[in-house]
Amino acid sequence: MIRKSKKITKLRGSRTCGYGAAKKHRGAGHKGGKGLAGVTKHRWIHTVKYMPDHIGKYGFKRHSSLIKELKVINLGQLDEIVSKNKESFEIVDGKIVIDITTLDYEKVLGKGKITCPMIIKAVEFSESAKEKIESAGGEFVEL
């Protein structure tokens, strides 16, 4: 078996151990910076190959004052709540009256089916929810 001596043992005693001038082996400056410093300057091949999405701007952030985050409930969920607790809701002209805001919701979405006519009061309704409520013989009231 061949035993090859390590390069560093050969270089011991030579003051700079193969790094040229002593100042070239100091700090990160000689290496081109720490971390991701210089990825658009002198580490370009690595950037293009391994981090192609790292450079450039993508999309935008909407201003927080423009974003409306409403708590939503689907018609199917609402129908389940009503069918379990019919006694707790008011009935007017054979229609169950529900105020969504008392249930801590603000918007009604149209997923699911309604089995009985209802008068639903909410801040907002989706178009499909409006159609389904009316087709079931109910009404919607926007607050």
Curated annotation (Swiss-Prot):
Leader peptide range in chain numbering: none
Keywords: Ribonucleoprotein, Ribosomal protein, RNA-binding, rRNA-binding
One Pfam family linked to the record: Ribosomal_L27A
Any GO MF annotation of the entry: structural constituent of ribosome
GO BP terms: translation
GO cellular component, one term: cytosolic large ribosomal subunit
Domain of life, source organism: Archaea
PROSITE patterns: RIBOSOMAL_L15
Task performed by this protein: Binds to the 23S rRNA.
Family per record: Belongs to the universal ribosomal protein uL15 family.
Oligomeric and partner information: Part of the 50S ribosomal subunit.
Protein name: Large ribosomal subunit protein uL15
Species of origin: Methanococcus aeolicus (strain ATCC BAA-1280 / DSM 17508 / OCM 812 / Nankai-3)
